[in-house]
Swiss-Prot record:
Known role: Catalyzes the phosphorylation of N-acetyl-D-glucosamine (GlcNAc) derived from cell-wall degradation, yielding GlcNAc-6-P.
Cross-referenced InterPro entries: ATPase_NBD, N-acetyl-D-glucosamine_kinase, ROK, ROK_cs
Organism: Aliivibrio salmonicida (strain LFI1238) (Vibrio salmonicida (strain LFI1238))
Taxon lineage: Bacteria, Pseudomonadati, Pseudomonadota, Gammaproteobacteria, Vibrionales
Catalysis performed (reactions): N-acetyl-D-glucosamine + ATP = N-acetyl-D-glucosamine 6-phosphate + ADP + H(+)
MF term (GO), any: zinc ion binding
Binding locations of ATP: 4-11, 133-140
Gene3D superfamilies referenced in this protein's UniProt entry, alphabetically: 3.30.420.40
Pathway per the UniProt entry: Cell wall biogenesis; peptidoglycan recycling
Example GO BP: peptidoglycan turnover
The enzyme's E.C. designation: 2.7.1.59
Keywords: ATP-binding, Carbohydrate metabolism, Kinase, Metal-binding, Nucleotide-binding, Transferase, Zinc
Protein name, per record: N-acetyl-D-glucosamine kinase
Amino acid sequence: MYYGFDVGGTKIEFGAFNEKLERVATERIPTQTEDYSLLVNDIASLIAKYDAEFGVEGKVGLGIPGMEDAETGALLTSNVPAAKGQFLRKDLEAKIGRSVKIDNDANCFALSEAWDEELKDSPSVLGLILGTGFGGGLVFDGKVFSGYSHVAGELGHSRLPIDAWFHLGEKAPLLECGCGNKGCIDNYLSGRGFELLYAHYYGQEKKAIDIIKANEAGDADAVEHVDRFMELLAICFANLFTCFDPHVVALGGGLSNFALIYDELPKRLPKHLLSVARVPRIIKAKHGDSGGVRGAAFLNIK
């Protein structure tokens, strides 16, 4: 039995999956935001509850909005303040008496998609989230690639490539990122970035959904903005694809619902890729909000 926990800022979602990777249990509880010991106890209590229900000790995986320090194991997270700087994996292991896997929630999203029935035989799957932020994860042969320092999936904190700057023009905004650097693609390719760029160029704040509707209605500013954004996506994605050369790319987050992306990217990508490079298959993620808990559970698949 595989247990997955999607530990978010306001709630923890639990899911249990059998050996066929079918979900057989679901539970949601509020996230303890201040008391770390209660946070650990809440997770341990759910594990004990479902161990008793299924009569087995489930294999435990946690997905978190952050990462472990590769040297100390301390948790780097701002969205779960009770766990910031704490040794969540080690403390939970001591509490329940078994090993625990932990990874970034974007990596869990990618892993969930990679283990979808349709994609599980794909040698490499790149999961990209175009939501409030931009991030992702890379899965090789069914395993997350986290890298030397556990930051391999922090794609949103790579910088805009030079051709993207030229594409945005001389009035391009140099946006400051929450990580302390400037020019991180998180601030440009995310749903938030889609809105920020529109406000920057047209002096008017609009929600992404309203910009998309205006584009479909033929509004000149929205059409120009969407065209500029699609090319920006193609440039930045081409840089990522040149690094990773994935077989399949699964898109999640709010902007992944923008159907035009799946028409435009395959047409725009080739001119930004090496001449011998093939455009990967680009699809909308299948598992949506359940991807985090699925991927967390599947961290234990060998």
